[in-house]
Amino acid sequence: MRLAALVATAVALAGCGKAELARGPYELIVREPRGEAAATEPQVTAYEWAVARDRLARLRQAQPERPYVERVRLAIGDPRTGKRYEARGAVAINPGRAARMMLVGPGGTTALDVWVTKDRFRFSVPAINLQKRGGTDPADARGLPIGMLRWWFLSPLAGRLLLARSTSAESAWILREGPATVTLRSDGDRFVALRREGNVLEGIEWFARGLVPQAGAHGQYLEGRFGLRVDVVVEEVLPTEPDPEAFADPDEPGTAL
């Protein structure tokens, strides 16, 4: 099932008070397992739980702990304008703490500058003097690809494990991180994830061998409210760590994390 279809399905289910969870082991739509919903969840055997929990632990253990930089190619499609923007640049990531993405436009000018931490963000398009700042309220970032960085690049596997299922080929997990619920399924080479916080939904489909920085990894992020789509290709992972200043608030020099 394609990512857009998964998001559409999740949105539809979110509006149906008594909709049951899908019975297929890898179609766990975002819904907190409590109350009436808990009674409709498929039963998970102890073996399935153990296998899925072990696979999640191995994915988490492989996550980088040190800051790193990826050279990326992005294409951003905005259905509100019908336009598609393409650019290259770099993303500096301090896992679990902060990320800074800068895309370069014609003539080497900065086309886009995005800084995010777990509780703040700054989105800037210098060419048109556009700047937006926000915090953790999902409404602050609607229509912007903030979630792609804050969630998928900073801490894609964060959260308390609520439910897990497995077969020999695939596993699926439901994670709870604060007010957000994340549904993730993978066969180890392809990851499909949905994140829901209140009425805000976002999803990503990611192709890579595990969730470690690697050239050739690619995916598609979809913002659920306006349908903003971001296609990402990792072209290179640099061998050196980024300057700590990369993670400083751009408007407050000297505040590197």
Model regions: which residues?
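C-terminal motif of bacterial Sec signal peptides marking the signal peptidase cleavage site
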Residues: 13-15
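N-terminal leader/targeting segments and the immediate start of mature chains
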Residues: 17-86, 94, 237, 244-257
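Hydrophobic lipid-interacting interfaces of membrane-associated proteins
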Residues: 33-35, 73-79, 106-109, 119, ...
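Beta-strand-dominated lipid-handling architectures at cellular/organellar boundaries
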Residues: 68-73, 82-90, 96, 115, ...
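Extracytoplasmic segments of membrane-associated envelope/inner-membrane machinery
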Residues: 132-166, 173-176, 184
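Gly/Pro-enriched, hydrophobic low-complexity segments
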Residues: 164-257
